[in-house]
Swiss-Prot record:
Residues 1-38 are annotated as: Disordered. This is Protein PB1-F2. It is found in: Host mitochondrion inner membrane; Host nucleus; Host cytoplasm, Host cytosol. GO terms for cellular component: host cell cytosol; host cell mitochondrial inner membrane; host cell nucleus; membrane. Plays an important role in promoting lung pathology in both primary viral infection and secondary bacterial infection. Promotes alteration of mitochondrial morphology, dissipation of mitochondrial membrane potential, and cell death. Alternatively, inhibits the production of interferon in the infected cell at the level of host mitochondrial antiviral signaling MAVS. Its level of expression differs greatly depending on which cell type is infected, in a manner that is independent of the levels of expression of other viral proteins. Monocytic cells are more affected than epithelial cells. The lineage of its organism: Viruses, Riboviria, Orthornavirae, Negarnaviricota, Polyploviricotina. Is not encoded in all strains, and seems to be dispensable for replication.
Amino acid sequence: MGQEQDTPWILSTGHISTQKRQDGQQTPKLEHRNSTRLMGHCQKTMNQVVMPKQIVYWKQWLSLRNPILVFLKTRVLKRWRLFSKHE
C-alpha cells in the first residue's frame, strides 16, 4: 500500500478511504474526495464543446420578437407559395 500512495492519481485526488463490508472486511472505497470536482470538470469540458451551437441558437431565438408568430408567418407564407404554384 506504500507504493500505491506514491502514484500521481492518489496524490492528486486525495486519500483512499476504506469501508467495512457486512462480513467485517475492509475494502477501499471507489470514490475519492475530488471525484465530484472531477465530474464537474468533465461536464464543463463537454459543455464548452456544445456551447457555440447553443449560443447561435439562443441568438436566433432572441432576435425573434415573438417566435410563435414568426413561425406561423413563415409557415403560412410557405403554404401560400405552394398553393400559388399549383394554380
